[in-house]
């Protein structure tokens, strides 16, 4: 979402298209209404392995497959961490079954991936591609951490649970 505070920080163009707060809020309201009464899945996890820079993300979505995907991608909190989790730093709402109407919603297709950095809210609709959730989390981390003077890296590594190698 375009606001004066972030306008000059985003490379607006054919891919990153600005959306006004009023349009963002209208689509968000429609997505929330769409999700009412539906089975949803919620996952609370961490992005960023260094505790000094870790951000808490709450993922709310309608597809179990997408929830499983992000559950395997983000860092899962321990029982103790989950008990002390508190409020998420960012919330992602993914409603792939909700299709935007470009003529009414002011977007360019039935899908929309929108980030409101000031409200710490990400809305994804009209796309069943689970990677949009991942991309949104990483885009948020890239934006937020660079503001903190940190150059984020998009990488992962596996470790043997027995040998820790």
For every predicted segment, state its role.
Residues 1-164:
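A noncatalytic interaction/capping subdomain that flanks phosphate/NTP-handling catalytic cores
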């Amino acid at each position: 979402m375009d606001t004066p505070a972030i306008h000059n920080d985003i490379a607006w163009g054919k891919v990153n298209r600005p959306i006004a707060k009023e349009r963002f809020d209208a689509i968000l309201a429609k997505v929330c209404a769409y999700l009412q009464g539906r089975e949803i899945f919620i996952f609370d996890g961490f992005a960023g392995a260094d505790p000094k820079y870790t951000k808490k993300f709450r993922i709310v979505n309608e597809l179990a497959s997408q929830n499983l995907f992000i559950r395997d991608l983000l860092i899962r909190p321990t029982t103790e961490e989950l008990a002390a989790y508190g409020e998420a730093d960012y919330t992602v709402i993914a409603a792939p079954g909700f299709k935007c109407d470009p003529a009414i919603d002011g977007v360019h297709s039935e899908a929309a991936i929108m980030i409101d950095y000031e409200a710490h809210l990400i809305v994804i609709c009209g796309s069943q591609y689970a990677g949009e959730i991942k991309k949104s989390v990483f885009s948020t981390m890239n934006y937020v951490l660079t503001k903190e003077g940190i150059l984020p890296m998009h990488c992962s590594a596996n470790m043997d649970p027995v040998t820790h190698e």
